[in-house]
Amino acid sequence: MPRPKIARQICGRPANSCFKPNGRPMHQLEQVALAADEFEALRLVDLEGMQQQEAAVVMGVSRQTLANILKKARYKVVDCLSQGKALMMQASDPDTSGDIPL
């Protein structure tokens, strides 16, 4: 049985629920889901310029957990950009909390 997820602090939200290549209908695209905690980790580290340790404290997780979240998120973003897939932003799940609901 996997270990239960620690509640994560999610304070930012994406401007859109989906990013996809121009000129292709959504039904023709493979979709990749980006979880709320993955978006938040990318936002804090890559956009806000926080160190991983600082971002981990903000999200309420360990630095290693944040690094694992970032690795998954970056893989998904690069996969979508290089393969022409749609990147779908998921709403926050019950294991997250924050100031702004997704």
From Swiss-Prot:
<dbReference type="InterPro" id="IPR036388">
    <property type="entry name" value="WH-like_DNA-bd_sf"/>
</dbReference>
<dbReference type="InterPro" id="IPR013324">
    <property type="entry name" value="RNA_pol_sigma_r3/r4-like"/>
</dbReference>
<comment type="similarity">
    <text>Belongs to the UPF0251 family.</text>
</comment>
<dbReference type="InterPro" id="IPR002852">
    <property type="entry name" value="UPF0251"/>
</dbReference>
<dbReference type="Pfam" id="PF02001">
    <property type="entry name" value="DUF134"/>
</dbReference>
<protein>
    <recommendedName>
        <fullName>UPF0251 protein ASA_1331</fullName>
    </recommendedName>
</protein>
